[in-house]
Amino acid sequence: MKKLLEGKTPANEITENLKKEIKNLKNDGINPTLCVIEVGDDPASKIYLRVKRNLAKKVGINEVGLHFPADTSQAELLGKIKELNQDPNINGIMVQLPVPPQIDPRAIFETIAPEKDADGFSPLNLGRLWEGQSDIIPATVRSILTLIDYYGIKMAGKNTVIIGRSVIVGKPLAAVLLERDATVTIAHSKTKNLADLTRNADVIISDVGKAHLVTEDMVKDGAVLIDVGMNRENGKLMGDVDFDTVAPKANAITPVPGGVGPLTVASLMKQAVILTRKQHGR
């Protein structure tokens, strides 16, 4: 391994830049405000929300938290989102996932106004990504791009395999990497002979949530690996890539934890500021 793609350093740089940017906005009478909605009491969500709130406070974003009970109907939640869409004091809206089964996440994505879409999941913003016309990007995708740029990884002409086709990571990531002239293949649960694809890949990005999915025999020498997966095995947090065996072959690889993860919340805060600027014609 020539390069460890750790995310803490670029995340800290984003945080410091956001502090300065938000201070300047506040000096002009603009107070970036992000509304974070939680439905139910998912333990993992509680932890992630705490991290979001702490960083929002640190950089100077006004975070408005709304909590709904687990039995909240979809209609009630969507009604509240529509109210927030019309509130000029709210610049960004996000709903913490997962939500209870009676609520369809797609309905949430379709209801949040694109100009207040902090997560970057609205159909309009995702469509604009495919046209190369949007800087509203899902936070995990922005985190991956930040790592790519921070460490000077050139994507043009690179055979790139994305493992995972979610609307949150895989599909929008393919869109932005195509804009960077990468040759992109998306693999998923029905893909046959995954190893044949990854062995020819210059860059492998995995977002599946399956430990030891990508092993040493599936990776060519000098490949770049970006691991978005999160798994817990025997009390240890790990990604999709079998780090210990793959790292010696890789030109660059992200650790888990400490790679993409530290950047995701910082990327969300950056998006809230982008939305605020757009709403104020900045």
UniProtKB/Swiss-Prot annotation:
Reaction catalysis annotation: (6R)-5,10-methylene-5,6,7,8-tetrahydrofolate + NADP(+) = (6R)-5,10-methenyltetrahydrofolate + NADPH; (6R)-5,10-methenyltetrahydrofolate + H2O = (6R)-10-formyltetrahydrofolate + H(+)
Top-level taxon of origin: Bacteria
GO MF annotations, alphabetized: methenyltetrahydrofolate cyclohydrolase activity; methylenetetrahydrofolate dehydrogenase (NADP+) activity
GO cellular component, one term: cytosol
Biological processes per GO annotation: L-histidine biosynthetic process; methionine biosynthetic process; purine nucleotide biosynthetic process; tetrahydrofolate interconversion
Oligomeric and partner information: Homodimer.
Family per record: Belongs to the tetrahydrofolate dehydrogenase/cyclohydrolase family.
Name under which the protein is recorded: Bifunctional protein FolD
Lineage: Bacteria, Bacillati, Bacillota, Bacilli, Lactobacillales
Name of the gene this protein is made from: folD
